[in-house]
From Swiss-Prot:
Keywords: Early protein, Host cytoplasm, Hydrolase, Magnesium, Metal-binding, Nucleotide metabolism, Virion. GO terms for molecular function: dUTP diphosphatase activity; metal ion binding. Its EC number is 3.6.1.23. Transmembrane segments: none annotated. Induction: Expressed in the early phase of the viral replicative cycle. This is Deoxyuridine 5'-triphosphate nucleotidohydrolase. It is an enzyme of class 3 (hydrolase). One of its GO terms (cellular component) is virion component. It comes from African swine fever virus (strain Badajoz 1971 Vero-adapted) (Ba71V). The keyword Hydrolase applies. It catalyses: dUTP + H2O = dUMP + diphosphate + H(+). It comes from the Viruses. Pfam families: dUTPase. One of its GO terms (biological process) is nucleotide metabolic process.
């Protein structure tokens, strides 16, 4: 059965880069590139970057988690950018906007242009996605229905792991 990503723009800016469509992953790429939806400048040190999208992943008909990983273009001889946590792990129950913590290791600000791809999404279990489904901005979609995990951001579950008594 299929592995699918569902991407929903949540701002007008994002709608321009994510028009409603279904994209078949003919090349069988493991990662799904994610656009920056506006020009931005990353100052030296820690930066928070809004991606203006919600994302859900489904494998074999069941919602699953996914990873946010840096693309090789994120760190080049012109710029030294890294994800603050190395790899972002998104819980299956998270239904909020995707955001990044990016560290600019350089001494000068770095310009990022709209439509530049710094990160990619990889399904839990490293399953190759069959389709990337781009939804309408205000479309009601079951995989984005409220969950106990909700829309809280970075480390917001407030619990240390899953082992509880």
């Amino acid at each position: 059965m299929a592995t699918n990503f569902f991407i929903q723009p949540i701002t007008q800016e994002a709608e321009a880069y994510y028009p409603p469509s279904v994209i078949t992953n003919k090349r069988k790429d493991l990662g799904v590139d994610v656009y920056c939806c506006s020009d931005l400048v990353l100052q030296p040190g820690l930066n928070i970057v809004r991606l203006h999208i919600k994302v859900a992943c489904e494998h074999m008909g069941k919602k699953c988690g996914f990873k946010i990983m840096a693309r090789s273009s994120m760190c080049t001889h012109e710029r030294l950018l890294i994800l603050a946590n190395g790899i972002g792990l998104i819980d299956p129950g998270y239904v909020g906007e995707l955001m990044l913590k990016i560290i600019n290791l350089g001494d000068t600000p770095v310009q990022i242009w709209a439509k530049e791809c710094l990160v990619q999404l990889v399904a839990q279990g490293d399953h190759v996605p069959d389709h990337i489904n781009i939804l309408k901005r205000n479309q009601i979609f079951p995989l984005f229905a409220p969950t106990p995990r909700g829309e809280g951001r970075f480390g917001s579950t407030g619990e240390a792991g899953i082992m509880r008594t």
